[in-house]
Regions:
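Intrinsically disordered, low-complexity non-transmembrane regions of multi-pass membrane transporters
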Residues: 1-32, 61-84, 258-289, 537-542
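Hydrophobic core segments of alpha-helical transmembrane domains in multi-pass membrane transport
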Residues: 40-55, 109-117, 148-150, 188-195, ...
Length: 542
Protein backbone atom coordinates (compact mmCIF):
# COMPACT_ATOMS: atom_id res chain seq x y z
CA UNK A 1 0.00 0.00 0.00
CA UNK A 2 2.94 2.31 0.61
CA UNK A 3 3.95 2.13 -3.04
CA UNK A 4 0.87 4.02 -4.29
CA UNK A 5 1.62 7.29 -2.45
CA UNK A 6 5.25 7.12 -3.61
CA UNK A 7 4.11 6.69 -7.24
CA UNK A 8 1.75 9.65 -6.88
CA UNK A 9 4.56 11.77 -5.41
CA UNK A 10 6.84 10.88 -8.30
CA UNK A 11 4.12 11.91 -10.76
CA UNK A 12 3.53 15.13 -8.84
CA UNK A 13 7.23 15.99 -9.03
CA UNK A 14 7.32 15.38 -12.76
CA UNK A 15 8.32 18.54 -14.61
CA UNK A 16 6.54 20.17 -17.54
CA UNK A 17 6.16 18.17 -20.74
CA UNK A 18 8.24 18.60 -23.88
CA UNK A 19 5.64 20.75 -25.63
CA UNK A 20 5.30 23.05 -22.61
CA UNK A 21 9.08 23.43 -22.46
CA UNK A 22 9.07 24.27 -26.18
CA UNK A 23 6.45 26.98 -25.60
CA UNK A 24 8.46 28.32 -22.67
CA UNK A 25 11.52 28.59 -24.92
CA UNK A 26 9.49 30.39 -27.61
CA UNK A 27 8.12 32.78 -25.01
CA UNK A 28 11.56 33.39 -23.50
CA UNK A 29 13.23 34.04 -26.85
CA UNK A 30 10.34 36.16 -28.06
CA UNK A 31 10.38 38.29 -24.93
CA UNK A 32 14.11 38.93 -25.36
CA UNK A 33 13.03 41.12 -28.24
CA UNK A 34 12.62 44.82 -27.46
CA UNK A 35 9.29 46.58 -26.91
CA UNK A 36 6.95 45.91 -29.87
CA UNK A 37 7.16 49.54 -30.97
CA UNK A 38 10.96 49.37 -30.99
CA UNK A 39 10.84 46.01 -32.75
CA UNK A 40 8.70 47.30 -35.61
CA UNK A 41 10.97 50.34 -35.94
CA UNK A 42 14.07 48.12 -36.11
CA UNK A 43 12.40 45.77 -38.61
CA UNK A 44 11.47 48.73 -40.81
CA UNK A 45 15.11 49.85 -40.83
CA UNK A 46 16.22 46.28 -41.52
CA UNK A 47 13.93 46.14 -44.55
CA UNK A 48 15.72 49.21 -45.92
CA UNK A 49 19.10 47.47 -45.67
CA UNK A 50 17.88 44.14 -47.07
CA UNK A 51 16.14 45.85 -49.98
CA UNK A 52 19.36 47.63 -50.90
CA UNK A 53 21.29 44.36 -50.86
CA UNK A 54 18.53 42.56 -52.79
CA UNK A 55 18.56 45.11 -55.62
CA UNK A 56 22.36 45.13 -55.69
CA UNK A 57 22.33 41.32 -56.05
CA UNK A 58 19.60 41.62 -58.71
CA UNK A 59 17.02 39.47 -56.96
CA UNK A 60 14.23 38.74 -59.42
CA UNK A 61 11.77 35.97 -60.29
CA UNK A 62 9.35 35.27 -63.12
CA UNK A 63 5.90 36.68 -62.40
CA UNK A 64 3.48 33.71 -62.45
CA UNK A 65 0.47 35.93 -63.14
CA UNK A 66 -0.83 36.01 -66.72
CA UNK A 67 0.10 38.89 -69.02
CA UNK A 68 -2.16 41.91 -68.81
CA UNK A 69 -2.97 41.49 -65.14
CA UNK A 70 -2.80 44.71 -63.14
CA UNK A 71 0.57 45.10 -61.42
CA UNK A 72 2.48 42.78 -63.76
CA UNK A 73 5.52 44.32 -65.43
CA UNK A 74 5.88 44.27 -69.21
CA UNK A 75 8.90 41.95 -69.11
CA UNK A 76 7.11 39.51 -66.77
CA UNK A 77 9.61 39.80 -63.91
CA UNK A 78 9.20 40.63 -60.23
CA UNK A 79 12.27 42.53 -59.06
CA UNK A 80 13.43 43.52 -55.60
CA UNK A 81 12.96 47.27 -55.14
CA UNK A 82 15.57 49.12 -53.10
CA UNK A 83 14.59 51.81 -50.63
CA UNK A 84 18.26 52.65 -50.02
CA UNK A 85 18.49 55.22 -52.79
CA UNK A 86 17.22 58.76 -53.45
CA UNK A 87 13.94 57.52 -54.95
CA UNK A 88 13.33 55.22 -51.97
CA UNK A 89 14.07 57.97 -49.46
CA UNK A 90 11.67 60.33 -51.24
CA UNK A 91 8.99 57.65 -51.25
CA UNK A 92 9.41 57.09 -47.52
CA UNK A 93 9.38 60.80 -46.71
CA UNK A 94 6.32 61.54 -48.83
CA UNK A 95 4.30 58.55 -47.59
CA UNK A 96 5.20 58.46 -43.89
CA UNK A 97 1.88 60.06 -42.95
CA UNK A 98 -0.30 58.21 -45.47
CA UNK A 99 1.25 54.88 -44.44
CA UNK A 100 -0.10 55.60 -40.95
CA UNK A 101 -3.48 57.09 -41.84
CA UNK A 102 -4.07 54.51 -44.58
CA UNK A 103 -3.23 51.50 -42.40
CA UNK A 104 -6.39 49.38 -42.76
CA UNK A 105 -7.10 48.54 -39.09
CA UNK A 106 -6.58 52.10 -37.84
CA UNK A 107 -9.74 53.70 -39.21
CA UNK A 108 -11.72 50.56 -38.42
CA UNK A 109 -10.68 50.62 -34.78
CA UNK A 110 -11.20 54.36 -34.34
CA UNK A 111 -14.71 54.45 -35.83
CA UNK A 112 -15.90 51.26 -34.14
CA UNK A 113 -14.58 52.32 -30.74
CA UNK A 114 -16.52 55.59 -30.91
CA UNK A 115 -19.65 53.46 -30.72
CA UNK A 116 -18.19 51.04 -28.18
CA UNK A 117 -17.18 54.00 -26.00
CA UNK A 118 -20.79 55.18 -25.79
CA UNK A 119 -21.87 51.64 -24.90
CA UNK A 120 -19.33 51.59 -22.06
CA UNK A 121 -20.26 55.08 -20.83
CA UNK A 122 -23.98 54.28 -20.76
CA UNK A 123 -23.42 51.00 -18.92
CA UNK A 124 -25.03 48.93 -21.69
CA UNK A 125 -21.87 46.92 -22.35
CA UNK A 126 -21.38 46.15 -18.67
CA UNK A 127 -25.02 45.11 -18.25
CA UNK A 128 -24.84 42.84 -21.29
CA UNK A 129 -21.70 41.19 -19.94
CA UNK A 130 -23.26 40.64 -16.55
CA UNK A 131 -26.37 39.15 -18.17
CA UNK A 132 -24.13 36.83 -20.19
CA UNK A 133 -21.98 35.87 -17.21
CA UNK A 134 -24.94 35.25 -14.92
CA UNK A 135 -27.04 33.42 -17.52
CA UNK A 136 -24.63 31.37 -19.62
CA UNK A 137 -23.57 27.85 -18.52
CA UNK A 138 -19.95 28.17 -17.37
CA UNK A 139 -18.93 24.89 -18.99
CA UNK A 140 -20.02 26.16 -22.44
CA UNK A 141 -18.49 29.64 -22.20
CA UNK A 142 -15.27 28.78 -24.05
CA UNK A 143 -17.10 26.96 -26.85
CA UNK A 144 -19.54 29.86 -27.24
CA UNK A 145 -16.66 32.35 -27.47
CA UNK A 146 -14.78 30.32 -30.11
CA UNK A 147 -17.90 29.60 -32.18
CA UNK A 148 -19.08 33.22 -32.10
CA UNK A 149 -15.59 34.36 -33.09
CA UNK A 150 -15.45 31.99 -36.07
CA UNK A 151 -18.85 33.16 -37.30
CA UNK A 152 -17.87 36.81 -36.82
CA UNK A 153 -15.12 36.58 -39.43
CA UNK A 154 -17.84 37.05 -42.06
CA UNK A 155 -17.39 40.68 -41.01
CA UNK A 156 -13.83 40.38 -39.74
CA UNK A 157 -13.62 43.87 -38.24
CA UNK A 158 -16.37 43.07 -35.73
CA UNK A 159 -14.47 40.04 -34.48
CA UNK A 160 -11.19 41.87 -33.97
CA UNK A 161 -12.55 45.14 -32.63
CA UNK A 162 -15.45 43.89 -30.50
CA UNK A 163 -15.35 40.16 -29.77
CA UNK A 164 -11.68 39.70 -28.85
CA UNK A 165 -11.58 42.48 -26.20
CA UNK A 166 -15.04 41.40 -25.03
CA UNK A 167 -13.93 37.79 -24.52
CA UNK A 168 -11.09 38.93 -22.26
CA UNK A 169 -13.51 40.96 -20.14
CA UNK A 170 -15.99 38.07 -19.88
CA UNK A 171 -13.33 35.56 -18.83
CA UNK A 172 -12.06 37.93 -16.15
CA UNK A 173 -15.60 38.48 -14.86
CA UNK A 174 -16.05 34.74 -14.23
CA UNK A 175 -12.69 34.40 -12.50
CA UNK A 176 -10.73 33.00 -15.44
CA UNK A 177 -7.57 34.42 -17.01
CA UNK A 178 -8.57 37.23 -19.40
CA UNK A 179 -5.74 36.35 -21.79
CA UNK A 180 -7.28 32.89 -22.19
CA UNK A 181 -10.50 34.53 -23.36
CA UNK A 182 -8.56 36.81 -25.69
CA UNK A 183 -6.62 33.84 -27.10
CA UNK A 184 -9.78 31.76 -27.64
CA UNK A 185 -11.50 34.59 -29.51
CA UNK A 186 -8.37 35.45 -31.53
CA UNK A 187 -8.01 31.79 -32.50
CA UNK A 188 -11.62 31.75 -33.68
CA UNK A 189 -11.63 35.03 -35.60
CA UNK A 190 -8.22 34.75 -37.25
CA UNK A 191 -7.08 31.12 -36.94
CA UNK A 192 -10.46 29.92 -38.18
CA UNK A 193 -10.60 32.65 -40.81
CA UNK A 194 -11.81 30.45 -43.68
CA UNK A 195 -14.33 28.43 -41.67
CA UNK A 196 -17.88 29.72 -41.37
CA UNK A 197 -21.53 28.73 -41.53
CA UNK A 198 -22.14 31.71 -43.83
CA UNK A 199 -20.68 32.87 -47.13
CA UNK A 200 -18.34 35.79 -46.46
CA UNK A 201 -16.72 38.53 -48.49
CA UNK A 202 -13.51 36.54 -48.95
CA UNK A 203 -15.31 33.69 -50.78
CA UNK A 204 -16.12 35.51 -54.05
CA UNK A 205 -12.75 37.26 -53.89
CA UNK A 206 -10.75 34.01 -53.79
CA UNK A 207 -13.09 32.36 -56.30
CA UNK A 208 -12.37 35.11 -58.82
CA UNK A 209 -8.61 34.66 -58.45
CA UNK A 210 -8.95 30.88 -58.77
CA UNK A 211 -11.03 31.25 -61.95
CA UNK A 212 -8.34 33.39 -63.58
CA UNK A 213 -5.61 30.95 -62.52
CA UNK A 214 -7.51 27.93 -63.89
CA UNK A 215 -8.02 29.80 -67.14
CA UNK A 216 -4.27 29.64 -67.78
CA UNK A 217 -4.53 26.00 -68.88
CA UNK A 218 -8.28 25.73 -69.54
CA UNK A 219 -9.99 28.70 -71.28
CA UNK A 220 -13.43 27.32 -70.32
CA UNK A 221 -12.81 28.73 -66.84
CA UNK A 222 -13.79 32.38 -67.23
CA UNK A 223 -15.99 34.98 -65.51
CA UNK A 224 -19.59 34.38 -66.56
CA UNK A 225 -18.77 31.02 -68.17
CA UNK A 226 -20.20 27.66 -67.15
CA UNK A 227 -16.97 26.69 -65.40
CA UNK A 228 -16.61 29.93 -63.42
CA UNK A 229 -15.64 29.11 -59.81
CA UNK A 230 -18.62 30.19 -57.64
CA UNK A 231 -18.40 31.86 -54.24
CA UNK A 232 -19.92 28.68 -52.78
CA UNK A 233 -17.10 26.49 -54.14
CA UNK A 234 -15.84 25.54 -50.64
CA UNK A 235 -19.01 26.11 -48.61
CA UNK A 236 -19.70 22.52 -47.46
CA UNK A 237 -16.14 21.92 -46.30
CA UNK A 238 -15.91 25.28 -44.54
CA UNK A 239 -19.31 24.77 -42.88
CA UNK A 240 -18.13 21.50 -41.32
CA UNK A 241 -14.78 23.11 -40.47
CA UNK A 242 -16.56 25.64 -38.24
CA UNK A 243 -17.53 22.96 -35.74
CA UNK A 244 -14.12 21.29 -35.88
CA UNK A 245 -12.43 24.63 -35.16
CA UNK A 246 -14.83 25.24 -32.26
CA UNK A 247 -14.04 21.86 -30.67
CA UNK A 248 -10.28 22.16 -31.14
CA UNK A 249 -10.22 25.79 -29.97
CA UNK A 250 -12.17 24.89 -26.84
CA UNK A 251 -9.90 21.95 -25.97
CA UNK A 252 -6.69 23.91 -26.58
CA UNK A 253 -7.94 26.78 -24.41
CA UNK A 254 -8.95 24.61 -21.44
CA UNK A 255 -6.25 21.93 -21.65
CA UNK A 256 -3.15 23.86 -22.77
CA UNK A 257 -3.48 27.64 -22.76
CA UNK A 258 -5.21 28.26 -19.43
CA UNK A 259 -2.97 25.91 -17.40
CA UNK A 260 0.12 27.53 -18.95
CA UNK A 261 -1.09 31.08 -18.25
CA UNK A 262 -1.68 30.25 -14.59
CA UNK A 263 -3.44 32.63 -12.25
CA UNK A 264 -4.23 36.16 -13.38
CA UNK A 265 -2.26 38.80 -11.46
CA UNK A 266 -4.19 42.11 -11.37
CA UNK A 267 -1.07 43.92 -10.13
CA UNK A 268 0.49 43.47 -13.58
CA UNK A 269 -2.55 44.86 -15.41
CA UNK A 270 -3.40 48.42 -16.43
CA UNK A 271 -4.61 50.68 -13.63
CA UNK A 272 -7.91 51.57 -15.33
CA UNK A 273 -9.27 48.03 -15.66
CA UNK A 274 -12.86 47.54 -14.59
CA UNK A 275 -13.66 45.89 -11.25
CA UNK A 276 -14.21 42.14 -11.90
CA UNK A 277 -16.84 42.02 -9.16
CA UNK A 278 -19.03 44.23 -11.35
CA UNK A 279 -19.54 41.25 -13.63
CA UNK A 280 -21.20 39.27 -10.83
CA UNK A 281 -23.69 41.86 -9.53
CA UNK A 282 -27.38 41.12 -10.08
CA UNK A 283 -29.05 43.38 -12.64
CA UNK A 284 -31.29 46.08 -11.18
CA UNK A 285 -34.90 46.51 -12.44
CA UNK A 286 -33.86 49.65 -14.34
CA UNK A 287 -30.99 47.79 -16.01
CA UNK A 288 -33.26 44.91 -17.01
CA UNK A 289 -35.79 47.34 -18.49
CA UNK A 290 -33.01 49.20 -20.27
CA UNK A 291 -31.68 45.95 -21.77
CA UNK A 292 -35.14 44.98 -23.01
CA UNK A 293 -35.71 48.34 -24.70
CA UNK A 294 -32.19 48.33 -26.13
CA UNK A 295 -32.84 44.84 -27.50
CA UNK A 296 -36.11 45.97 -29.08
CA UNK A 297 -34.23 48.89 -30.61
CA UNK A 298 -31.73 46.50 -32.17
CA UNK A 299 -34.55 44.37 -33.60
CA UNK A 300 -36.18 47.44 -35.16
CA UNK A 301 -32.83 48.50 -36.62
CA UNK A 302 -32.24 45.00 -38.02
CA UNK A 303 -35.69 45.14 -39.62
CA UNK A 304 -34.84 48.46 -41.21
CA UNK A 305 -31.52 47.08 -42.43
CA UNK A 306 -33.30 44.11 -44.00
CA UNK A 307 -35.66 46.48 -45.84
CA UNK A 308 -32.63 48.34 -47.19
CA UNK A 309 -30.79 45.18 -48.22
CA UNK A 310 -33.16 42.40 -49.28
CA UNK A 311 -35.48 43.97 -51.92
CA UNK A 312 -34.06 44.07 -55.44
CA UNK A 313 -34.04 47.87 -55.40
CA UNK A 314 -32.69 48.08 -51.85
CA UNK A 315 -30.32 50.92 -51.08
CA UNK A 316 -27.72 48.51 -49.73
CA UNK A 317 -27.62 46.39 -52.89
CA UNK A 318 -25.22 46.88 -55.76
CA UNK A 319 -27.27 47.79 -58.86
CA UNK A 320 -24.36 46.80 -61.12
CA UNK A 321 -24.29 43.23 -59.84
CA UNK A 322 -26.79 40.54 -60.73
CA UNK A 323 -25.29 37.35 -59.34
CA UNK A 324 -25.27 35.66 -55.95
CA UNK A 325 -26.92 37.46 -53.04
CA UNK A 326 -23.51 37.78 -51.37
CA UNK A 327 -22.28 39.79 -54.38
CA UNK A 328 -25.38 41.98 -54.48
CA UNK A 329 -24.98 42.77 -50.79
CA UNK A 330 -21.34 43.76 -51.08
CA UNK A 331 -22.08 47.45 -50.24
CA UNK A 332 -23.67 46.37 -46.96
CA UNK A 333 -20.85 43.96 -46.13
CA UNK A 334 -18.31 46.70 -46.80
CA UNK A 335 -20.25 48.95 -44.43
CA UNK A 336 -19.78 46.69 -41.41
CA UNK A 337 -17.71 49.23 -39.47
CA UNK A 338 -20.32 51.93 -40.02
CA UNK A 339 -23.03 49.50 -38.92
CA UNK A 340 -21.06 48.61 -35.78
CA UNK A 341 -20.84 52.33 -34.99
CA UNK A 342 -24.59 52.90 -35.40
CA UNK A 343 -25.68 49.64 -33.77
CA UNK A 344 -23.67 50.47 -30.66
CA UNK A 345 -24.62 54.14 -30.34
CA UNK A 346 -28.41 54.03 -30.82
CA UNK A 347 -29.21 51.18 -28.36
CA UNK A 348 -26.70 52.67 -25.89
CA UNK A 349 -28.54 56.00 -25.91
CA UNK A 350 -31.87 54.19 -25.40
CA UNK A 351 -30.40 52.19 -22.51
CA UNK A 352 -28.81 55.29 -21.00
CA UNK A 353 -32.04 57.27 -21.13
CA UNK A 354 -33.89 54.47 -19.31
CA UNK A 355 -31.26 54.02 -16.58
CA UNK A 356 -30.33 57.70 -16.32
CA UNK A 357 -26.69 57.20 -17.32
CA UNK A 358 -27.13 59.26 -20.52
CA UNK A 359 -28.96 62.54 -19.96
CA UNK A 360 -27.78 64.66 -22.86
CA UNK A 361 -25.39 64.90 -25.78
CA UNK A 362 -22.47 65.70 -23.46
CA UNK A 363 -22.66 62.21 -21.96
CA UNK A 364 -22.52 60.65 -25.42
CA UNK A 365 -19.52 62.78 -26.40
CA UNK A 366 -17.84 61.99 -23.08
CA UNK A 367 -18.11 58.26 -23.84
CA UNK A 368 -16.51 58.75 -27.25
CA UNK A 369 -13.72 60.84 -25.73
CA UNK A 370 -12.93 58.24 -23.10
CA UNK A 371 -12.68 55.53 -25.75
CA UNK A 372 -10.25 57.62 -27.79
CA UNK A 373 -8.10 58.48 -24.76
CA UNK A 374 -7.40 54.79 -24.13
CA UNK A 375 -5.88 54.29 -27.60
CA UNK A 376 -2.59 56.13 -27.05
CA UNK A 377 -0.29 53.06 -26.87
CA UNK A 378 -2.10 51.44 -29.79
CA UNK A 379 -1.69 54.54 -31.98
CA UNK A 380 2.07 54.60 -31.33
CA UNK A 381 2.36 50.89 -32.13
CA UNK A 382 0.31 51.24 -35.32
CA UNK A 383 2.47 54.10 -36.60
CA UNK A 384 5.62 51.96 -36.65
CA UNK A 385 3.83 48.76 -37.68
CA UNK A 386 2.32 50.59 -40.65
CA UNK A 387 5.75 51.78 -41.80
CA UNK A 388 7.17 48.26 -41.57
CA UNK A 389 4.30 46.69 -43.53
CA UNK A 390 4.44 49.40 -46.21
CA UNK A 391 8.23 49.16 -46.61
CA UNK A 392 8.00 45.37 -46.88
CA UNK A 393 5.30 45.57 -49.57
CA UNK A 394 7.16 48.22 -51.58
CA UNK A 395 10.31 46.08 -51.81
CA UNK A 396 8.55 43.00 -53.30
CA UNK A 397 10.51 40.81 -50.88
CA UNK A 398 7.39 38.99 -49.71
CA UNK A 399 6.20 38.32 -53.25
CA UNK A 400 9.63 37.06 -54.34
CA UNK A 401 9.76 34.74 -51.33
CA UNK A 402 6.31 33.36 -52.20
CA UNK A 403 7.29 32.60 -55.79
CA UNK A 404 10.59 30.99 -54.75
CA UNK A 405 8.76 28.81 -52.24
CA UNK A 406 6.22 27.78 -54.87
CA UNK A 407 8.95 26.92 -57.37
CA UNK A 408 10.71 24.83 -54.73
CA UNK A 409 7.55 22.84 -54.10
CA UNK A 410 7.06 22.08 -57.80
CA UNK A 411 10.50 20.43 -57.89
CA UNK A 412 9.34 17.64 -55.56
CA UNK A 413 7.24 16.30 -58.47
CA UNK A 414 4.68 14.69 -56.15
CA UNK A 415 1.51 12.99 -57.38
CA UNK A 416 -1.66 11.71 -55.71
CA UNK A 417 -3.33 13.17 -52.62
CA UNK A 418 0.02 13.48 -50.83
CA UNK A 419 0.80 16.52 -53.01
CA UNK A 420 -1.57 18.64 -50.91
CA UNK A 421 0.43 18.30 -47.69
CA UNK A 422 3.55 20.20 -48.83
CA UNK A 423 1.26 22.64 -50.65
CA UNK A 424 -0.63 23.46 -47.44
CA UNK A 425 2.62 23.73 -45.46
CA UNK A 426 4.06 26.09 -48.07
CA UNK A 427 0.93 28.27 -47.81
CA UNK A 428 1.40 28.34 -44.02
CA UNK A 429 4.95 29.60 -44.47
CA UNK A 430 4.11 32.22 -47.10
CA UNK A 431 1.27 33.50 -44.91
CA UNK A 432 3.84 34.48 -42.28
CA UNK A 433 5.08 37.16 -44.70
CA UNK A 434 2.02 38.00 -46.81
CA UNK A 435 -0.80 38.67 -44.39
CA UNK A 436 -3.48 39.34 -47.01
CA UNK A 437 -5.34 36.22 -48.17
CA UNK A 438 -6.13 37.73 -51.56
CA UNK A 439 -2.59 39.06 -52.12
CA UNK A 440 -1.04 35.71 -51.28
CA UNK A 441 -3.46 33.78 -53.49
CA UNK A 442 -3.04 36.24 -56.36
CA UNK A 443 0.68 35.42 -56.39
CA UNK A 444 0.58 31.67 -55.72
CA UNK A 445 -2.64 30.63 -57.52
CA UNK A 446 -1.19 31.09 -61.05
CA UNK A 447 1.51 28.57 -60.08
CA UNK A 448 -0.35 25.98 -58.06
CA UNK A 449 -3.79 25.91 -59.64
CA UNK A 450 -2.46 24.96 -63.11
CA UNK A 451 0.17 22.65 -61.58
CA UNK A 452 -2.33 20.68 -59.49
CA UNK A 453 -4.92 20.68 -62.26
CA UNK A 454 -2.41 18.91 -64.51
CA UNK A 455 -2.20 16.06 -61.99
CA UNK A 456 -5.98 15.76 -61.94
CA UNK A 457 -7.41 17.93 -59.14
CA UNK A 458 -10.14 20.53 -59.54
CA UNK A 459 -9.57 24.24 -58.83
CA UNK A 460 -12.24 24.09 -56.10
CA UNK A 461 -10.31 21.46 -54.11
CA UNK A 462 -7.03 23.31 -54.62
CA UNK A 463 -8.60 26.52 -53.29
CA UNK A 464 -9.94 24.68 -50.21
CA UNK A 465 -6.46 23.34 -49.44
CA UNK A 466 -4.97 26.82 -49.82
CA UNK A 467 -7.45 28.27 -47.32
CA UNK A 468 -6.27 25.81 -44.65
CA UNK A 469 -2.68 27.00 -44.94
CA UNK A 470 -3.72 30.64 -45.14
CA UNK A 471 -5.78 30.50 -41.94
CA UNK A 472 -3.73 28.45 -39.50
CA UNK A 473 -0.71 30.76 -39.23
CA UNK A 474 -2.65 34.05 -39.13
CA UNK A 475 -2.47 34.05 -35.33
CA UNK A 476 1.33 33.78 -35.06
CA UNK A 477 2.51 36.35 -37.59
CA UNK A 478 3.06 40.06 -36.86
CA UNK A 479 2.31 40.64 -40.55
CA UNK A 480 -1.39 40.05 -39.82
CA UNK A 481 -2.87 43.55 -39.94
CA UNK A 482 -4.70 43.31 -36.59
CA UNK A 483 -1.76 41.79 -34.69
CA UNK A 484 -0.87 45.18 -33.21
CA UNK A 485 -4.41 45.65 -31.91
CA UNK A 486 -4.43 42.21 -30.27
CA UNK A 487 -1.06 42.93 -28.66
CA UNK A 488 -2.29 46.28 -27.33
CA UNK A 489 -5.40 44.67 -25.79
CA UNK A 490 -3.31 41.87 -24.25
CA UNK A 491 -0.92 44.39 -22.68
CA UNK A 492 -3.82 45.89 -20.71
CA UNK A 493 -3.86 42.67 -18.69
CA UNK A 494 -0.08 42.33 -18.46
CA UNK A 495 1.95 45.51 -18.88
CA UNK A 496 5.17 43.48 -19.35
CA UNK A 497 3.72 41.13 -21.95
CA UNK A 498 5.83 40.85 -25.09
CA UNK A 499 5.43 39.44 -28.57
CA UNK A 500 6.96 36.17 -27.37
CA UNK A 501 4.21 35.60 -24.81
CA UNK A 502 1.46 36.29 -27.34
CA UNK A 503 2.96 34.05 -30.03
CA UNK A 504 3.70 31.25 -27.53
CA UNK A 505 0.09 31.46 -26.36
CA UNK A 506 -1.23 31.12 -29.91
CA UNK A 507 1.15 28.40 -31.21
CA UNK A 508 -0.88 25.53 -29.68
CA UNK A 509 -3.93 26.73 -31.60
CA UNK A 510 -1.94 27.07 -34.83
CA UNK A 511 -0.46 23.57 -34.62
CA UNK A 512 -3.72 21.95 -33.50
CA UNK A 513 -5.76 23.69 -36.19
CA UNK A 514 -3.27 22.64 -38.86
CA UNK A 515 -3.28 18.98 -37.80
CA UNK A 516 -7.05 18.86 -37.39
CA UNK A 517 -7.83 20.72 -40.61
CA UNK A 518 -5.44 18.68 -42.76
CA UNK A 519 -6.89 15.48 -41.30
CA UNK A 520 -10.44 16.68 -41.99
CA UNK A 521 -9.44 17.63 -45.55
CA UNK A 522 -8.06 14.19 -46.36
CA UNK A 523 -10.98 12.38 -44.70
CA UNK A 524 -13.64 14.61 -46.29
CA UNK A 525 -12.21 14.75 -49.81
CA UNK A 526 -10.37 11.45 -50.28
CA UNK A 527 -11.66 8.97 -47.68
CA UNK A 528 -15.36 9.91 -47.88
CA UNK A 529 -15.26 11.33 -51.40
CA UNK A 530 -17.45 14.30 -50.47
CA UNK A 531 -17.46 17.57 -52.45
CA UNK A 532 -15.95 20.69 -50.87
CA UNK A 533 -18.92 22.72 -52.06
CA UNK A 534 -22.29 22.36 -53.81
CA UNK A 535 -21.56 21.03 -57.29
CA UNK A 536 -17.79 21.28 -56.78
CA UNK A 537 -15.93 18.37 -58.42
CA UNK A 538 -12.95 16.78 -56.71
CA UNK A 539 -11.07 15.85 -59.85
CA UNK A 540 -10.32 17.73 -63.05
CA UNK A 541 -10.55 16.13 -66.47
CA UNK A 542 -9.31 18.20 -69.43
Amino acid sequence: MAEAPRRRNRRARKGPGLFTRFLNVVEFLGNLLPHPVTLFAVLALLILLVSGMAEMLDWQVDDPRPAGVSGRSEDGLIRAVSLMNPEGMRRIAMNLVTNFTGFAPLGTVLVALLGVGVAERSGLLGALLRALVLGAPRNLLTAVVVFASVVSNTASEMGYVVLIPLAAVVFRAVGRHPLAGLAAAFAGVSGGYSANVLIGTVDPLLAGITTEAARIIDPSYAPGAVNEIPATANYLFMFVSTFMITVIGTLVTTRIVEPKLGKFEPSRAADDLEDPEEGLKTLSPEEKRGLKLAGLTVLVMLGGLALLALPENGWFRDPAVNALLIDDLRPMLRSVVSLIFVFFIVPSIVYGRVTGSVRNDRDVIDGMGRAMSSLGPYMVLVFFAAQFVSFFNWTNLGTITAVVGADLLTRFDLTGPVVFLPFILMCCFVNLMLGSASAQWAVTAPIFVPMLMTVGYSPEVIQAAYRIGDSTTNIITPMMSYFGLILAVAMRYDRKLGIGTLIATMIPYSISYLIGWVTLFYVWVFALGLPVGPGSPTYYTP
